[in-house]
Amino acid sequence: LDGKIIASNKITCFNTRGTNYLGRTFAKNIDIPAGQVQALWIGINLPETARGKYNGNVSISANGVPAKSIKMEIEISGKTVADHGIDEGKHLSRLAWLNSNVGINNKITRGYIPVSREDKVIKILGRSTEIGDNGLPEKIMSYFTSSNQSISKQGGDIIDKPFQFIIEKENGEIVHLLPGKLQFTQQSPSFITWKVINTSDECDVVCNGRLEFDGFASFGLQIKAKKAISIKDIRLKVTMDKDKATYMMGLNKEGGLRPKDWQWKWDTTKNQDALWTGAVNGGLQIKWKAENYVLPLVNIYYDFGCLHLPPSWGNEGKGGVNVYEKGKSVIINAYSGTREMKKGEQLNYDFELLETPDRKRVV
């Protein structure tokens, strides 16, 4: 219209591209079963100066069929809507929030302190984590007092033993992984990252870790087979101090006192992939995931965006988690069961941690 245009980068199909919850751009294809109908949700960020009729074409393409061009015309009155109509749900303007970058930055929230490191020990507010040679936590401590109202100089152990990532072959033999050099790759006031390559005759395991100022940590364990391997089990074993495992919530267990024994299997009909067990002044939340993770929808919308079974941990329904007492410790054993790995095949055994309590500076 009179030489004016609405640029294509102002037009978004929310189904096919956008910004994810980590602030990263993505694009994806849509799979539609034969005979089914799929609505495409499209938003246009109109310039405030736009008015009149605008004409254009939308091209829709699919595998195996020619692209279809659809003519589109919109008429703009020129009147502006307050806050883009976000205050009224009927306008559906809030769909734009799906691509928001609000709150995505590396700034430290007020009340926390910068992340610091002394050799292999990473310190955050009220907690410390020592990284083992293999890249996994070797020691996690809480310095919060029993009332959780102050921080003491004397810390208490949250875990009794280092995290163990175990690859057991069909014959019962454990794959001996030799850690390479532990490299701290990035450090800022809000986070620290590190990397280790663990090697063996059968496979390599690359460990990437990240710990943030509030106690959130993420771990990526990528296994690459050097030759064909028959596997009995691949598991992550976390040994917690019994005094720091008083309560439990998650994996189909409502919040309350931790049972002496709890067994759980992967089931994507339920939004369950994480466990918290702890006490008032120390604990761990663990979430198991893989490369196909997408944040599920909740409540009545869950069936429209359910949990994806991790190919690694889930292993076609063979995987699960057992929680049980052993002496003065509580064992969290996340197993994945039998499988065959071909030469060159890769598996991603990822998980997240939250070292609790997660709270701001106290007196």
What spans do the regions from the language model cover?
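Short acidic/proline- and small/hydrophobic-mixed sequence motifs that coincide with surface turns
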Residues: 6, 67-68, 229-232
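A short beta-strand micro-motif common to beta-rich folds, especially ectodomain repeats
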Residues: 52-63
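Residue-level signal for glycine
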Residues: 3, 64-66, 201-203
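Conserved small/polar residues in nucleotide/adenosyl-binding loops
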Residues: 362
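A surface/secretory-pathway sequence property marking extracellular, secreted
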Residues: 1-23
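Beta-strand/loop-rich accessory regions of lumenal/periplasmic or secreted enzymes
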Residues: 17-31, 41-44, 51, 78-345
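Short, hydrophobic beta-strand segments
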Residues: 38-48, 352-354
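C-terminal edge beta-strand
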Residues: 68-77
